[in-house]
From Swiss-Prot:
It is found in: Cytoplasm. This is Putative pre-16S rRNA nuclease. Gene3D superfamilies: YqgF/RNase H-like domain. Could be a nuclease involved in processing of the 5'-end of pre-16S rRNA. The lineage of its organism: Bacteria, Bacillati, Bacillota, Bacilli, Lactobacillales. Belongs to the YqgF nuclease family.
Amino acid sequence: MRLLGLDVGSRTVGVAVSDPMGWTAQGVEIIRINEDEKEFGLARLGEIIKEKQAKGVVVGLPKNMNNSEGPRAEAARQYAQMVEDQFNLPTDFQDERLTTVQAERMLVEEADVSRKKRKQVIDKIAAEFILQNYLDANGPLTK
């Protein structure tokens, strides 16, 4: 069963997909959004869900280091609810603390990617880390 992983920001949503067995995650794309204008990229997300035949969605939950939740965590929860309502898919959350830092470090240290190119792919890679961490901890989404 394929799952999507989402890294929800205020301007972009990074998207990753699992393999059919639910073992590995791979980055797909970055969807541009505009929270102020209530444009959440759901049409494009729906196309990806259909194309990849996703059966569930894992949304990164940006917790603070003390495990509390701030405004971005609330925005991620609201986005997950919109996805669940619009596409009738189960959603779950994965702590995304340090995934962007991890993605940035990988791009700099291992791939030697320029700053400009990093900005173009960082959210997609963060979504990949979110989904992979979820798969490693929980296996396929079954709720």
